[in-house]
């Protein structure tokens, strides 16, 4: 083959690699306001049934607040704390309480310096298959494991809608 033939073949190959298919929009699922509200209200109702006054926050896939509810009689810090828990669970794709162990194993990861970060237990990521579409966090129960149990009950309630 001549040099011109190689150049033409290279240009043709380059044109094939840059096709409109690589410029398509992303297809993704996001939490609806209705599902987010259901998760927050169910988490609060579950905790309330156990005698805990809590606040709940549900964040979307980008960490933005979708729903935040302060429970009757809860201290003001529970709003911020429920957000930090949810934001941490969304950002790192794990239950918020697992961050403490991660930091012990890798203190140089720097997560502790992020705004909105916490190691407190009480939030879970909301998954659609392997995709994290958000997270829910609760604060106010006497112990993060109780907060987390309320979140789990709420996510379990809407699990059939997360497909």
Each predicted region: which residue ranges?
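Bacterial N-terminal signal peptides
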Residues: 8-20
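N-terminal secretory signal peptides that target proteins for export/translocation
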Residues: 1-6
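Flexible, solvent-exposed loop/hinge segments and secondary-structure transition points
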Residues: 23-163
